[in-house]
Amino acid sequence: GAVFGYAASKVNKIQKIEVKKETLKESITEEVEHKSGYLNVAVFGLDSRDGSLDKGNRSDTIMIASLNKATGEVKLVSVYRDTLLKLDDGSYNKANAAYSYFGPDGGVALLNENMDMNIEKYVSVNFNALVDVIDAVGGMDLELTDAEVVHMNNYCVETSKVTGKDYEKIEPEVE
């Protein structure tokens, strides 16, 4: 209940980018346009350091959330960001380049064209949104090797500066 309420309050603060529906529909083939019963939403996790959600940011995370309208069941599929796929301009590049070069409409077009999807809606989040969600659920417990602890501490310094949030240095476990 409390996590849902917190998440709902954050949704109202989401930065929105207007994309013409016609632009998204251009990448939907006639065959998949007529499929119904599901709502497919593209989810992009961006490497944005300045809070922007438009082109120029690579999508480190690319997922498709598919909602079965009859049952309410949601399935998530991740698309590996380094997968070589056809971009909106006909060239081939890593999947995460589509958002950077063409913005969210290019990211959605990439999924529609290469995955035979009918996606018309998308959600883009940056580091701040990820930190807020982790805080809302009370943090995360991870098992890390000593080498991973070193990398996480380095990463946390940058993330802390970007998000304006404090963090506690991770100490290796002593056995």
Positions of PLM-derived features:
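Non-catalytic, solvent-exposed segments at the cell envelope interface
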Residues: 3-175
